[in-house]
């Protein structure tokens, strides 16, 4: 069982997008830009995910990661349009890590950014999209080399390594290969809810 704040962060990093399971494949797997109506459906994934894990005792501490990871510092995020310190810190932290991962991950329609360019994007968006404190902390961890070393060690496509073990960013930078683990956990959650 996962215990403690670091464990909750690790599990939150893995499960934050679990609600996408409830999004129709025609939207979730679409390679072109989503229509406005489709985007409104996609924006429901934090609430869908929160409903999936609600009531499962050992997952209660990860609810803020799931529910608030799309809220932006300037209030233009979703699902509730919270801003600044209205957003639980788990959501503010995960947004920075998830954005870095998204920017540096190659997609079918674009190559991933060089990590240094992604760091610059975080810097430019702090105080707008991201909590300035967490951007600064992320950049400090980056400059110390622990994040870069871990990404090099894992080839960017593996589970976060021991190099991030003591960083608050540990396991919040999750590659898309973690989706398989997420789906396995989702199946267990659904089975537990049915019992």
Model-derived regions, located:
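Metal-dependent catalytic cores of enzymes that make or break cyclic nucleotides
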Residues: 1-192
